[in-house]
Each structure stands twice: as structure tokens, then as C-alpha cells.
């Protein structure tokens, strides 16, 4: 496909569910249908095809999502991320309480120079967006493919400083 648009179900499934066992390269720990749908959307795109999905933001840094991030951000590249400040105003007519983002991804091996990150308070104030253009390597970083959702220049500067550290806290003996 040239384009895929999705609002997949947000639902954890058992590790031994057929959907999870069919995709062991992306499923680890506690699989969720939304990232299985997103993986299949990306898989079914033609080269340079685009997808837009509204999904929870938990995949951006959660340990259970590492395999998904590795697949998703190797086969595709983030071009735009939209953040909602409110957890309960995205699906205001439903009882969904979820930190939700909209992502635009292109199926390509070519890494873009930047990612656009926009944010709004709810699903009804897209006319009042804040917008930030951030270097791709600052947003998607590390061997775990973490996605850093910065919203202003101060956060960008903090992230630049953090990326200069070459060791993790556990690597220097700090335990939590």
C-alpha cells in the first residue's frame, strides 16, 4: 500500500496468543494489539509508503516494546509526532484514559535529518499547536531505539546534554 491509516485496538494479549506467537520478532513480555497492528501496517507498505497511526505513547520507551521499536524504527522512520497533553480529552466521547500520540512514519531505510513534534491539549484545539523541529538522532537514540518526546527548546538542550554521557547509572554502580 502507499498509505495506511490506523486507530488500532489498545489491548494487552497473552504471550501465547496466536497474534503474539506469529510475530516473535516484535513481541516480548506483555504484547499489545496496537503495536502488532502498527507492525503489520508498516510491513504492508510499499517502499516510501506512509502511515499515520493514533496509538498509546508507551511504546516509545517501555522495555516490553524494545523489539517492536527496533523493527519499527529500522524498517520505517518517524517524520512527525503529535502529542496530546491531556490523557482524557483525546477520545472525549469514550472512556479511554491513555497517553496518546499520532505518528507519521515513512517506510524507508533513509534516516531524515529532523522530526517534527507538535502538541495540543486535546482533540479539539489543533488550531493552537506548538511545533518543534528536532534532529532525528536526538529523538530516536540508543541501541534500545528510545523515542524522546521533547516539547520545547529547554527539553532539547537537556537531551543534548544527556546524550553526551557514555555510561548508564547501572554501568557506574548506581542501583535503584
PLM ranges: what are they?
Residues 1-176:
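Signature of N6-adenine DNA methyltransferases within the class I
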